[in-house]
Curated annotation (Swiss-Prot):
<dbReference type="InterPro" id="IPR005072">
    <property type="entry name" value="Peptidase_M44"/>
</dbReference>
<dbReference type="GO" id="GO:0006508">
    <property type="term" value="P:proteolysis"/>
</dbReference>
<keyword id="KW-0862">Zinc</keyword>
<dbReference type="GO" id="GO:0044423">
    <property type="term" value="C:virion component"/>
</dbReference>
<feature type="binding site">
    <location>
        <position position="112"/>
    </location>
    <ligand>
        <name>Zn(2+)</name>
    </ligand>
</feature>
<keyword id="KW-0946">Virion</keyword>
<comment type="function">
    <text>Probably involved in maturation of some viral proteins by processing them preferentially at Ala-Gly-|-Ser/Thr/Lys motifs. Does not seem to be responsible for the cleavage of major core proteins.</text>
</comment>
<dbReference type="GO" id="GO:0019058">
    <property type="term" value="P:viral life cycle"/>
</dbReference>
<dbReference type="GO" id="GO:0008270">
    <property type="term" value="F:zinc ion binding"/>
</dbReference>
<dbReference type="InterPro" id="IPR011249">
    <property type="entry name" value="Metalloenz_LuxS/M16"/>
</dbReference>
<keyword id="KW-0479">Metal-binding</keyword>
<feature type="active site">
    <location>
        <position position="44"/>
    </location>
</feature>
<comment type="similarity">
    <text>Belongs to the peptidase M44 family.</text>
</comment>
<keyword id="KW-0426">Late protein</keyword>
<dbReference type="GO" id="GO:0004222">
    <property type="term" value="F:metalloendopeptidase activity"/>
</dbReference>
<keyword id="KW-0378">Hydrolase</keyword>
<feature type="binding site">
    <location>
        <position position="41"/>
    </location>
    <ligand>
        <name>Zn(2+)</name>
    </ligand>
</feature>
Length: 591
């Protein structure tokens, strides 16, 4: 670890795929409480800008921090990626503090599309922020556009809170002149912020939250000590369904169950977690997980690898102490209990977006203060990989699981999805068959539409056949290479339970790079949040799908795009009754 005079921390991580990865602690949307919810997320969207033909890049805003990364591709170099990321924050050697109203307006439209996307695919339920005075979704809404001047002032104010002590930088390599460049830019920031934000309200403990969830989850408040953090690292590397959450200076260990009986037994204090010592902790975490640790606990004074001896040599005492603290919090009701509930009729009037949630007090009724049984946990395997064809009945359940677990990766091709995970076959089956997970998987049907229309365009099956078997999506006919013929009509309107644009496009020069560039252009115009592409077996032919509330504008953009003169697009309007009648004509597509 390299520490600059103003306390910026720099780490060299040669295993990282990114060229540069930067995080800012105490800079997430928990700072929006008592201001305008969404300022942090809007700032993230305003800052990031790059040439998608020579860079891969992204940014994210969480409850307590913001992070940005950039990777060079094609003709760009690692140094180019570093300078590009730094340019998001500095202009002519000075920290950016000026944002045009037109740019703010476009990005607010983009935020509304992101809200729509996330609300269609996920359940946006940030329980901790909600209990602390925020909303269940805090990423910003379209009504921010009514206060553009106030929003701009808040953005400038937020930039002035950045300080050296909040900055963490990972670089793949520290090339010649890179350290000097960091000194001249991030090293020029004050060690402490120019504007000190007000303290974040303390979240309420002792609550039961009934809301959509794939698991029965308990958030247990523990002290944010070094030993407890090492204990969390130990548990995270060893077991599934264990993680942590922070808000302000508070730390919660999250434990999820698939069995309601074990969950209730844990809550009553009659059972403890069965934590066994493994052979050795290697700290082989992803760069995302490592960055999260440094940002959530900015007081850590050493490289995490400096603690590898301590976490292995003292694991027994660390885990005993953590287990005792967990049990004490259960008995004292220093917990937040998340109980899966999928009723569409319930909502909390404090949530301005009217998401389904009910909050109750966690009482001491039925507490047993002498545990007499232990609950086994799901152990992690080193690695596992499966391939699921689009016709497999478990496809949507696996997609749902990957969306609810960050350590599961999906890679999609024309025939199916490749899934990398670290579960055993028995544990995967137990999750897939659990009542709460099945209800959760079925509670957001919008994600299914992406695969319904992919099946329609990539196979010879009729829309009627596909809809009849939508729970399993249909097997794609991939034994022979499909020849796709485009008809005269480029637009087909349908009614579904969601609003989106999808279809197939073909062009002689069409490739993934040009489509990614197109996606970023649509994002800058505020018309979409993201777009998915699948390369079909027919030459220069892609299937694309995007959720959007601006369907006509997106269609007009795609219809006039010279990249793909051949196109067949489906525009879905959201309605209570599905109507696919426009797709029942043979002129749509022939395979």
């Amino acid at each position: 670890m390299i520490v600059l005079p103003n306390k910026v921390r720099i780490f060299i991580n040669d295993r990282m795929k990114k060229d540069i990865y930067l995080g800012i602690s105490n800079f997430g949307f928990e700072n929006d409480i008592d201001e305008i919810l969404g300022i942090a997320h809007l700032l993230e969207h305003l800052l990031i800008s790059f040439d998608s033909t020579i860079f891969l890049a992204n940014a994210s805003t969480s409850r307590s921090y913001m992070s940005f990364w950039c990777k060079s591709i094609n003709s760009a170099t690692e140094s180019d990626a570093i300078r590009t990321l730094v340019s998001w924050f500095f202009s002519n050697g000075k920290l950016k503090d000026n944002f045009s109203l037109s740019s703010i307006r476009f990005h607010i439209k983009e935020l509304e599309n992101e809200y729509y996307f996330r609300n269609e695919v996920f359940h946006c339920m940030d329980i901790l922020t909600f209990l602390s005075g925020g909303d269940l979704y805090n990423g910003g809404r379209i009504d921010m556009i009514d206060n553009l001047n106030i929003v701009r002032d808040m953005l400038v104010n937020r930039m002035q809170r950045i300080s050296g002590s909040n900055i963490v930088i990972f670089v793949k390599r520290l090339g010649p002149g890179t350290l000097d460049f960091f000194n001249q830019t991030f090293g020029s920031l004050p060690a402490c912020p120019e504007i000190i934000p007000s303290s974040i309200p303390v979240s309420t403990n002792g609550k039961i939250v009934m809301t959509p969830s794939p698991f029965y989850t308990v958030m247990v408040k523990i002290n944010p000590t070094l030993d407890n953090i090492l204990g969390i690292l130990y548990l995270y590397e060893t077991y599934h369904l264990i993680d942590y959450e922070t808000i302000g200076n508070q730390l919660y260990l999250t434990v999820s169950f698939i069995d309601e009986t074990e969950y209730e037994s844990f809550l009553r204090g009659e059972a403890i977690l069965q934590i066994s010592q493994c052979q050795r902790i290697n700290m082989n975490y992803s760069d995302d997980y490592m960055m999260n640790i440094y940002l959530n606990f900015p007081w850590l004074s050493h490289d995490l690898y400096d603690y590898i001896t301590r976490i292995n040599d003292d694991s027994k005492s660390i885990l005993i102490s953590l287990t005792n603290e967990i049990y004490t919090s259960i008995i004292n009701r220093d917990i937040i209990v998340i109980y899966p509930n999928f009723s569409k009729a319930m909502c909390n009037t404090r949530d301005t977006q009217q998401h389904p949630i009910v909050v109750l007090d966690a009482t001491n009724d039925g507490l047993i203060k002498k545990p007499y049984r232990s609950i086994p946990l799901m152990k992690r395997l080193t690695s596992n990989e499966i391939f699921i064809r689009y016709g497999d009945a478990s496809l949507m359940d696996m997609i749902t699981l990957s969306l609810s677990k960050q350590d599961i990766s999906l890679k999609r091709n024309a025939e199916g999805i490749r899934v990398k995970h670290s579960f055993s076959a028995d544990d995967i089956q137990a999750i897939m068959e659990s009542d709460s997970f099945l209800k959760y998987s079925r509670s957001k049907p919008a994600a299914m539409y992406q695969y319904i229309f992919l099946s329609f365009f990539a196979s010879g099956n009729s829309i009627d056949d596909i809809l009849t078997n939508r729970d399993s999506t249909l097997e794609f006919s991939k034994k022979t290479k499909s020849k796709i013929l485009f008809g005269r009509n480029a637009r087909y309107d349908v009614t579904t339970k969601s609003s989106f644009v999808c279809g197939i496009v073909r062009g002689k020069l069409l490739d993934k790079t040009s489509l990614v560039e197109m996606m970023w252009d649509l994002k800058k115009k505020g018309l979409i949040y993201s777009m998915e592409f699948t390369n079909l077996l027919s030459k220069n032919t892609f299937y694309l799908f995007t959720f959007t509330i601006y369907t006509d504008e997106v269609y007009d953009y795609l219809n006039t795009n010279k990249l793909f003169p051949a196109k067949c697009l489906v525009i879905s309007t959201k309605g209570d009754v599905e109507n696919f009648s426009s797709l029942k004509k043979d002129v749509v597509i022939r395979v």
